[in-house]
């Protein structure tokens, strides 16, 4: 009977898919024992308590879980935006540091988590942008300026000189929706200085 249940569970698993324990509960009457056996034999890999990956083989070995699927299962929501602080380098403001932590804006969790070998810092926010535009990236840069390795004054000087290259209305809307109070204040100051 146990072998029949294990076979049914194996047939249910899809390579590259991420599962929560609750996704598999209907397949077994003794789920924890069967999950342990599937992990021990390599059919599943435990990522976090209650979170599992069905490994997918590639020509380079085991492929990591697709980030979007992983975060969606972990958060139990698709309202999130993941980015790397390395993306700030694309703004042309003089940021050059490389970071090995991904940032996830979401409405559920806050803190540092290790998932599938990757470090993620989850920021809980009331509003989460749907996509990472240049203007949203500027707002995120200002929101997290104290955490960056670069000198804040140098970044602010670069930003004030580059401000005309951004869509002003979209930047102010993004700041209003996703920015902290100090980010909104700083952008208003820049805006009034440029228009004066």
State where each predicted segment sits.
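Short beta-edge/loop segments at beta->alpha junctions of small alpha/beta modules
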Residues: 1-75
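Short coil/loop linkers at secondary-structure junctions
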Residues: 30-31, 94, 181
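Amphipathic alpha-helical interface surfaces
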Residues: 31, 83-84, 134
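Hydrophobic alpha-helix position signal
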Residues: 38, 87-88, 175
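Residues at alpha-helix termini
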Residues: 41, 91-94, 145, 178
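Short gly/ser-rich loop at a beta-strand->alpha-helix junction or flexible surface loop bordering the NTP-binding
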Residues: 46-56, 71-116
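A short, charged helix-loop
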Residues: 116-124
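Hydrophobic alpha-helical interaction segments
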Residues: 125-196
């Amino acid at each position: 009977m146990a072998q029949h249940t294990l076979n049914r569970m194996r047939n249910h698993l899809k390579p590259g898919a991420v599962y929560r324990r609750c996704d598999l509960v209907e397949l077994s009457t003794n789920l924890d024992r069967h999950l342990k056996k599937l992990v021990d034999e390599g059919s599943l890999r435990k990522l976090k308590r209650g979170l599992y990956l069905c490994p997918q083989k590639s020509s380079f070995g085991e492929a990591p879980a697709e980030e979007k699927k992983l975060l969606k299962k972990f958060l139990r929501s698709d309202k999130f935006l993941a980015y790397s602080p390395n993306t700030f380098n694309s703004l042309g403001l003089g940021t050059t540091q490389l970071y090995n932590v991904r940032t996830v804006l979401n409405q559920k969790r806050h803190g540092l988590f290790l998932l599938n070998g990757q470090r993620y810092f989850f920021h809980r926010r009331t509003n989460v942008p749907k996509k990472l535009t240049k203007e949203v990236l500027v707002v995120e840069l200002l929101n997290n300026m104290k955490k960056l390795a670069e000198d804040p004054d140098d970044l602010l000087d670069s930003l004030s000189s580059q401000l005309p290259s951004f869509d002003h209305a979209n930047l102010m809307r993004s700041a209003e929706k996703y920015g902290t109070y100090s980010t909104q204040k700083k952008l208003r100051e820049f805006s009034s200085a440029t228009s004066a």
